[in-house]
From Swiss-Prot:
<dbReference type="Pfam" id="PF12706">
    <property type="entry name" value="Lactamase_B_2"/>
</dbReference>
<feature type="binding site">
    <location>
        <position position="64"/>
    </location>
    <ligand>
        <name>Zn(2+) 1</name>
    </ligand>
</feature>
<keyword id="KW-0819">tRNA processing</keyword>
<protein>
    <recommendedName>
        <fullName>Ribonuclease BN</fullName>
        <ecNumber>3.1.-.-</ecNumber>
    </recommendedName>
</protein>
<feature type="binding site">
    <location>
        <position position="212"/>
    </location>
    <ligand>
        <name>Zn(2+) 2</name>
    </ligand>
</feature>
<keyword id="KW-0378">Hydrolase</keyword>
<keyword id="KW-0540">Nuclease</keyword>
<keyword id="KW-0269">Exonuclease</keyword>
<feature type="active site" description="Proton acceptor">
    <location>
        <position position="68"/>
    </location>
</feature>
<feature type="binding site">
    <location>
        <position position="68"/>
    </location>
    <ligand>
        <name>Zn(2+) 2</name>
    </ligand>
</feature>
<dbReference type="GO" id="GO:0004527">
    <property type="term" value="F:exonuclease activity"/>
</dbReference>
<feature type="binding site">
    <location>
        <position position="212"/>
    </location>
    <ligand>
        <name>Zn(2+) 1</name>
    </ligand>
</feature>
<feature type="binding site">
    <location>
        <position position="66"/>
    </location>
    <ligand>
        <name>Zn(2+) 1</name>
    </ligand>
</feature>
<feature type="binding site">
    <location>
        <position position="270"/>
    </location>
    <ligand>
        <name>Zn(2+) 2</name>
    </ligand>
</feature>
<dbReference type="InterPro" id="IPR013469">
    <property type="entry name" value="Rnase_BN"/>
</dbReference>
<feature type="binding site">
    <location>
        <position position="141"/>
    </location>
    <ligand>
        <name>Zn(2+) 1</name>
    </ligand>
</feature>
<dbReference type="InterPro" id="IPR001279">
    <property type="entry name" value="Metallo-B-lactamas"/>
</dbReference>
Length: 305
């Protein structure tokens, strides 16, 4: 998996940062895909600067209904429809996202020509496509808001072909069954258990993508042990009280969460427009002082998971 940041500003766009949107590129060898997390104003325009377009999207996850996370959605849906893309799309989000989509399309005389499914979520598992699971966590914000934890299923370990050949098993259909951990019977009557010839399973990658939030109990469960945590750092440590009063987090709080959750890496985003490049570097330094494995996202930054 890899993350492509389309917008990294909080509240309003700036000359260098658009409002929130993040692509998750699912780099599976046989079932690749592209998911979008939040869709602030101008998201479809930002996508023009990437290798992806709205037609490639399979799923969109909306954290909450504030405009800087949502107002780009109607235009993106309409453009996807105008392009003649027939592939289905599912939108996940809090209560009200269905009404928002229906109302904006109706009042603007617009529609979608592709199958559009809308799922209003609550805390808990919301998706398992056989390759990965998505769990929603309710966060602390003035509007109903969720963060999403995406965890790949573990991959089977490599098959020890050399040992199987030494045991008299020839490559072919039997190898496929053994790779699946099944027991096969050879022509001479011997039974071979595939599990005995498999290396340990390879742990799937995991990422936690937060919506806007002040510190809360659910945040630790959402982030616990993930390879990558994407979290807002709206304001610096000196403005912590103001951040919390508006349902946001400071640099200090975000970095402390990353440390307590033992994540592999923290990626900062949702930066207040009050900070210029120098100010952003100060935010980064505040986080790294607590959690060194921190990166600052810019628009079009790409990070592997």
């Amino acid at each position: 998996m890899e993350l492509i940041f389309l917008g990294t500003s909080a509240g309003v766009p700036t000359r260098s940062r658009n409002v929130t949107a993040i692509l998750l590129h699912l780099q599976h060898p046989t079932q690749p895909g592209v998911w979008l997390f939040d869709c602030g104003e101008g998201t479809q325009h930002q996508m023009l600067n990437t290798a992806f377009h709205p037609g490639k999207l399979e799923r969109i996850f909306i954290s909450h209904l504030h405009g800087d996370h949502l107002f780009g959605l109607p235009g993106l849906l309409c453009s996807r429809s105008m392009a003649g893309n027939p592939h289905p799309l599912t939108v996940y989000g809090p209560q009200g996202v269905r009404e928002f989509i229906a109302t904006t399309l109706r009042l603007s005389g617009s529609w979608t020509d592709f199958p559009l499914q809308i799922e209003e979520v609550s805390a808990g598992d919301i998706l398992d496509d056989g390759l990965r699971k998505v769990t929603a966590f309710r966060l602390e914000h003035p509007l109903e808001c969720y963060g999403y934890r995406v965890v790949e299923h573990d991959k089977p370990g490599a098959l020890n072909a050399r040992a199987l050949k030494a045991a008299g098993v020839t490559p072919g259909p039997l190898f496929q069954a053994l790779k699946a951990g099944k027991t096969v019977t050879l022509a001479d009557g011997r039974q071979i258990n595939g599990a005995d010839y498999l290396a340990p399973a390879v742990a799937g990658k995991s990422v936690a993508i937060f919506g806007d939030t002040a510190p809360c109990e659910a945040a630790l469960a959402l982030a616990q042990g993930v390879d990558v945590m994407v979290h807002e750092t709206t304001l610096d440590a000196s403005m912590e009280e103001k951040a919390n009063s508006r349902g946001h987090s400071s640099t200090r709080q975000t970095a402390t969460l990353a440390r307590e959750a033992a994540v592999g890496r923290l990626i900062m985003t949702h930066i207040s427009s009050r900070y210029d490049d120098k100010g952003c570097q100060r935010l980064l330094a505040e986080c790294r002082a607590i959690f060194p494995a921190t990166e600052l996202a810019y628009d079009f930054s790409v990070f592997p998971v």
